[in-house]
């Protein structure tokens, strides 16, 4: 199975008062195409920093990051932004929808930056909304949608570019238990359709939906295990 992500001796330090503060201390990790992986770890483990690097929102201090055949380790910001828009679909805890836009217009936003025509943008947005069961809410704005529906719109937006990776950061953090289960079942269906899913969470109940769990502690990978008891949707 081919790797969509390869990390080799990945390090990240932040500098404060001229002193290097190591956050990631030599991460080695392979994630294969169509895997479903949960990244876990307590506060201060380096989990959020690793997510930012995987999402091309930050760059490592040292080491190698290969994303779907691209060495992104030393890319400049403009190049990183281009790779990010093509290769990665983001789902955030805070949804980040624009309230003045309809669901379809929010979903189509990544295609604006890709230079896609307006008609094609809306057509592709409707396909993505269909995947998450919200085609009949395409003209609704966020204040006309429930929390679960808003997160489904955010997931559709992440899928609209057909990215190599769906990267979800605490995607159920603002949802009640019932809606969280519905959203996680949707991620399971998305994974089953062929997408690579990386889920960042601190909740064991959410991580159990993944097929593999990588736990970080103090900037290192503590365990990397297959989850034989993952929840079926």
Model-predicted regions and their roles:
Residues 1-13, 223-233:
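ABC-family P-loop ATPase nucleotide-binding domain
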Residues 213-225:
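H-loop (His-switch) and adjacent beta-strand-loop-beta switch element
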């Amino acid at each position: 199975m081919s790797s969509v992500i390869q990390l080799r001796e990945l390090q990240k330090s932040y500098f404060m008062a001229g002193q290097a503060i190591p956050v990631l201390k030599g991460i080695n990790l392979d994630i294969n195409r169509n895997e479903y992986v949960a990244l876990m770890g307590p506060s201060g483990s380096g989990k959020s920093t690793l997510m930012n690097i995987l999402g091309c929102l930050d760059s490592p201090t040292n080491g190698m990051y290969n994303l779907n055949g691209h060495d992104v380790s030393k890319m400049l910001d403009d190049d990183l932004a281009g790779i990010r828009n093509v290769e990665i679909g983001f789902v955030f805890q805070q949804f980040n929808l624009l309230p003045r836009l309809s669901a379809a217009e929010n979903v189509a936003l990544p295609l604006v930056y890709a230079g896609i025509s307006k008609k094609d943008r809306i057509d592709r947005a409707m396909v993505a909304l269909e995947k998450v069961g919200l085609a009949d809410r395409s003209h609704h704005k966020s204040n006309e949608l429930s929390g679960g529906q808003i997160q489904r719109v955010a997931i559709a937006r992440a899928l609209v570019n057909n990215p190599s990776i769906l990267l979800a950061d605490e995607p159920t953090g603002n949802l009640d238990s019932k809606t969280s289960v519905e959203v996680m079942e949707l991620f399971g269906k998305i994974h089953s359709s062929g997408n690579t899913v990386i889920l960042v969470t601190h909740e064991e109940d959410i991580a159990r939906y993944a097929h593999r769990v990588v736990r970080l502690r103090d900037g290192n990978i503590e365990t990397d295990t297959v989850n034989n008891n993952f929840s079926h949707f």
